[in-house]
Amino acid sequence: MRKAVVVFSGGQDSTTCLIQAIKNYDEVHCITFDYGQRHKLEIEVAQSITKELGITAHKVMDVGLLNELAISSLTRDNIEVSHELQANGLPNSFVPGRNILFLTLSGIYAYQIGAEAVITGVCETDFSGYPDCRDEFVKSLNQSLVLGMDRALKIETPLMWLNKAETWALADQYKQLDFVREKTLTCYNGIIGDGCGNCPSCDLRRAGLEDYLTNKDAIMADLVAKQAEGQA
């Protein structure tokens, strides 16, 4: 039996990855992290989506220590999410160490249940300036986990080389575009579905959807080509 662990936030990207994982694996587990994020609604949305998609194994893990160490607009209510980059060249929504911690803990969970893969929705094409969404980082951490646990494990990144329009196309390929659009929470201001329309996350999501709906055939063809090359 093939098992996988999906790092699941209830957002567009992780939900699309989950939908794909359900098709590709015999048993899918989800893990969601409570790190004192700006909106607790994120966890409720994640729980609701997993139930709707028939996932029976969904672990919500308390990693509040990350909130104590990582100061970000996503961990502090008194810091407004900004469209401008900080002096270090990163957006103020970057939570340092988040994906390092999440993927490491997910790898441990995969070890315990005998899963062959950890699946995450990080994406270098639309990575918003986050260094821990880069392919180079994921491959490096993957190697460290394999060495540290002396067990084969693959961190899968189905969206790594897709832009947002192609990510919408992937959801549509599984006949779940409307589900992803209506049920997920991507907005930094905590509004489900199409969101506030003003934050950086909503801007990226909306632009991708508009692009896909306007150029469906061409974008779907691009997605299929990337899938044939093993890039999705």
From Swiss-Prot:
GO terms for molecular function: ATP binding; ligase activity, forming carbon-nitrogen bonds; zinc ion binding. HAMAP family: QueC. It comes from the Bacteria. Disulfide bonds: none annotated. Keywords: ATP-binding, Ligase, Metal-binding, Nucleotide-binding, Queuosine biosynthesis, Zinc. It holds the Pfam family QueC. The keyword Protein biosynthesis does not apply. Catalyzes the ATP-dependent conversion of 7-carboxy-7-deazaguanine (CDG) to 7-cyano-7-deazaguanine (preQ(0)). Zn(2+) binds at residues 187, 196, 199, 202. Belongs to the QueC family. Its EC number is 6.3.4.20. ATP binds at residues 8-18. It comes from Photobacterium profundum (strain SS9). Binds 1 zinc ion per subunit. This is 7-cyano-7-deazaguanine synthase. It catalyses: 7-carboxy-7-deazaguanine + NH4(+) + ATP = 7-cyano-7-deazaguanine + ADP + phosphate + H2O + H(+). The keyword Lipid biosynthesis does not apply. GO terms for biological process: queuosine biosynthetic process. It is an enzyme of class 6 (ligase). Pathway: Purine metabolism; 7-cyano-7-deazaguanine biosynthesis. Its cofactor is Zn(2+).
